[in-house]
Regions:
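N-terminal leader segment of winged-helix/HTH proteins
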Residues: 1-28, 125-130
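Basic, amphipathic "hinge/linker" alpha-helix immediately C-terminal to the N-terminal HTH DNA-binding motif
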Residues: 82-103
């Protein structure tokens, strides 16, 4: 498989994943919220607002807004760091763990699906019939 084929496959998997997330019942996460959630759940060490901001190269207020929304959805919880009361630790929740597990399944299904532009025989947008 060539590099271009790999890229098309990845784009197709991403598209299928995003479409499935949009269609399902549940919270509609922004790209930033999803990046914060994935970082919190896929990194082994505890995450802080400061650390997330550095890792994702965004401002602390942007991380705080994303965490506010994720906390509203009960996907993360904040706790003051007992060793440094100025720092806030981001904790995982059962609902967030379930979302990540479901996301993995959605991605597996999307990876097996038809490539981009081949959804049920529909033509790729922007292409004229020949």
């Amino acid at each position: 498989m060539s590099g271009s084929d790999d890229t098309e496959s990845l784009v197709g998997t991403l598209r299928g994943t995003v479409v499935a997330l949009v269609r399902r019942d549940g919270p509609d996460l922004s790209a930033r919220q999803l990046a914060v959630l994935l970082t919190c759940y896929l990194e082994s060490e505890a995450q802080t607002v400061r650390g997330l901001a550095a890792t994702l190269d965004v401002s602390k207020p942007a991380i705080t807004r994303a965490l506010d929304r994720l906390a509203d959805f009960d996907m993360v919880r904040r706790k003051t760091d007992p060793t440094d009361r100025r720092s806030v630790l981001v904790q995982r929740t059962p609902k967030g763990t379930t979302f990540i597990r479901d996301l993995r399944g959605i991605m597996k299904e999307a990876a097996k699906a038809k490539p981009v532009g081949d959804a049920g025989g529909r033509k790729k947008p922007g292409r004229a019939a020949r």
